[in-house]
Amino acid sequence: MKKIALLVLLLTVGLVAGRAQESRQDVSISGSVLVEPWVTSTTDVSAGAKRAIGGLASYRFMLTPRGALEANYGFEQNNILYKGPTFLNGYKVNVRNQEITAAYVYNFTFRKFNPFVEGGGGALLWQSLRNEATTTLDLKNQTTIVGLYGAGVAYELSPSFDIRLEYRGILSKVPNFGDTLLNTNKYYNIYNPVIGVAYHF
């Protein structure tokens, strides 16, 4: 009888531990850099931007010991310069970017290092800001559907905390803010390195 009780206890502990492992979650806060490459197109309109510094907040839910679902919210502010045959001096658009994406993350484990890769998608919200850094244009806010991919590594500081370093790529159509004058009809790969701290619970 004692052996059966012990066996039931061990199975229960194992099941609870397994479920705890499967339901492990984490949140992370990171600093990010958004690098938009210079784009030229068949419409003779080109577009480019300075490097933008911002932030990224992420939440991960572990489906398995290696696989997780991730939700992201990012925020940056930048200037995009458009040039074309009829506006050689260019139009400067001051932009606030917001990222809302989700991805599947696959983790590897090597001692305290946890490399990972991810892929997913979502949306970028482009908000044109009216201020002295913006050329006067009748522009509208725009949302583009994006693809997301990335790879990085997490270094475990403790069972609850790790440092996370990642390169992310965001595939998006170049925005025109509702103005056909700014059409490039091009997609580009936005580079987005991030570094931050994650808390596991």
Report residues per predicted region.
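A broad helix-preferring feature
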Residues: 11-16, 26, 68-70, 146-148, ...
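Outer-membrane beta-barrel translocator domains and adjoining extracellular loop/strand segments
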Residues: 39-46, 81-88, 127-136, 175-182
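Transmembrane beta-strands of outer-membrane beta-barrel proteins
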Residues: 28-34, 72-74, 118-122, 166-168
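Short sequence motifs at beta-strands and strand-loop junctions characteristic
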Residues: 47-52, 92-99, 141-146, 185-189
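A charged, solvent-exposed segment within the mature domains of Sec-exported extracytoplasmic proteins
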Residues: 126-169
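Surface-exposed strand-loop-strand hairpins of Gram-negative outer-membrane beta-barrel proteins
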Residues: 33-56, 142-143
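Cleavable N-terminal export/targeting peptides
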Residues: 1-24
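Gram-negative (and chloroplast) outer-membrane scaffold detector with strong preference
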Residues: 22, 58-133, 155-157, 188-201
